[in-house]
A protein has these predicted regions:
Chain A
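C-terminal effector-binding regulatory domain of bacterial HTH transcription factors
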Residues: 1-3, 224-254
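Extended hydrophobic/aromatic segments used for targeting, binding, or gating
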Residues: 194-205
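Conserved amphipathic alpha-helical segments that form helical-bundle/coiled-coil interaction surfaces
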Residues: 107, 111-193, 212-214, 226-238
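Short linear motifs at protein or domain termini
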Residues: 1-113, 120, 124, 250-254
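Well-ordered alpha/beta subsegment
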Residues: 220-221
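Short helix-capping and inter-helix turn/linker motifs at the boundaries of alpha-helical repeat units
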Residues: 154, 205-206
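A short secondary-structure junction motif
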Residues: 25, 29, 88, 186-194, ...
Length: 254, 254
DNA sequence: GCTACCGTGTGGTCAGACCACATGGTCGGA
DNA sequence: TCCGACCATGTGGTCTGACCACACGGTAGC
């Protein structure tokens, strides 16, 4: 039913067995965030594989945002289980965009779909009771509006990204938050290029700030439909203005 | 302004330089799907790094669904650029679920959000003009209803997954399709466990088939709201019935 | 003409050797 | 007693070289 006989099973490549071992330890609860993995040399000896194979598996886990590695000795050294899905999501989406697997247009559209749901859920929750989870997002808005301290485009965009991410986090769905972060970061280069060619940045940033406040207002008013409409307009307007969707990772010339 | 002097810049780890090189080649169009990467040994020599570092980078690309490797010689050997985004999504989400980064509940919820948008878009498009893109999905439904040929639960679930994926593909947004596939696959183990404990599989499968037809009917009728409602009920009912969301990767006992 | 063979290049793996680094203990002096 | 310098230890990061299994493609022999 399961394995035919005794042999085989070993058909997987060495680094895959390492990955499987770690995954099963995670599922079994033998490994939880904060724990240290055994050292590469110990893992290699324990699993009967070479250290290079262990390293290939750890590299994958690192890129996927599951572990953090550090040299040296002490409590902070070695490979430690973390859980930072957004990092892996970013790398995944960005490379897929680069490889033509994803169109920038679809990335923007997907982000819109996810974020629409985020604000809808937040508005629903806020209609029932005040939402303290929104506090981080509000702080970011305050930071964006500091009088007398003009932000550069880059600084503004950084805060803008943080605001949208804060909304996603506030909704409580980590999967959506990670995906949104990944989608956004993966096209960040295009967004920044788009912002740099805008004729009047002052006008744009002023409008964006107003739209952010309006979105939050709709959420706090407990109006899902309004919040949804506003986030949609917010995203679509910006991307239409900067023409981000038409930017193509490929250079057709030369 | 940028680099202090001549040195440094090399601060990135060796395997990262390999990754960056490949990414930039992808963006520049020097590498497109179907192309062969240079051999590991050539890449190592060219970039001035060890072969093991090259391998770590290639391993990442493989897990992320960007390349396919094959031993031997000939046209099919070596590392070839592909673009299978769902593979990377699956690995990422599955491991994050295992590491407690993602809750199964949130995965299901996110899938629901994405799929709601898929059927909404399909219904809108279908309202304007017939949608030939739905053909693959319809074929799968036919296969699920073959009379006299009772499908096992596993076979049924495989077709079920294919149906939902076909809908996503029909919507034309590859990012959403890939993410949905990844989300679905990552919790497939839990879904199958849930199905295996259902009291009356015949009743369930009959109901699911009817629901599938109803969803398609709503799409073809060009009724976005109805399609949205039906897909939501379809997914929520099933997951409530099988209690998938409550399945926890951890075993609290022993 | 066909078959069997073998050279060649590929990824897959392992072993061993360094390196830089961060820690934590030890030893010496104040 | 206290404190600073020192160094042994263990970690990840990297490179080198060596095999292996495999798949192709040409070649020699039938």
């Amino acid at each position: 039913m399961s394995a035919a006989s005794a042999p085989a099973v070993d058909t997987a490549r060495a680094w895959e067995t390492v990955l499987q071992r770690i995954e099963s330890d995670l599922i079994a609860g033998a490994l939880t965030p904060g724990d240290h993995l055994p050292s590469e040399r110990a893992l290699a000896a324990e699993l009967g594989v070479g250290r290079s194979s262990v390293r290939e598996a750890l590299r994958v886990l690192e890129v996927l945002g599951l572990i953090r590695t550090q040299t040296g000795s002490g409590p902070q050294s070695g490979a430690i289980i973390i859980s930072r899905p957004s990092g892996g999501m970013t790398a995944l989406v960005r490379l897929q965009v680069a490889a033509h697997g994803f169109a920038v247009r679809d990335v923007v559209k997907t982000r819109l779909v996810l974020e629409s749901d985020v604000v809808t859920e937040l508005a629903r929750a806020s209609g029932a009771a005040p939402t303290p989870a929104l506090a981080p997002a509000l702080e970011i808005l305050d930071a964006m509006e500091q009088p007398g301290d003009e932000l550069t485009r880059d600084e503004f965009l950084t805060l803008d990204q943080a605001f949208h991410l804060a909304l996603a986090v506030a909704s409580g769905n980590e999967v959506i938050a990670a995906m949104m972060a990944g989608l956004r970061e993966s096209i960040e280069a295009y967004v920044r290029v788009g912002a740099s060619v805008l004729p009047s940045w002052d006008d744009t940033s002023t409008r964006l700030k107003a739209e952010h406040r309006a979105i939050v207002a709709a959420i706090e008013a407990g109006d899902p439909e309004l919040a949804r409409t506003r986030i949609r307009d917010h995203i679509e307007t910006y991307h239409a203005e900067t023409n981000v969707s038409s930017i193509h990772p490929h250079r057709e010339d030369t």
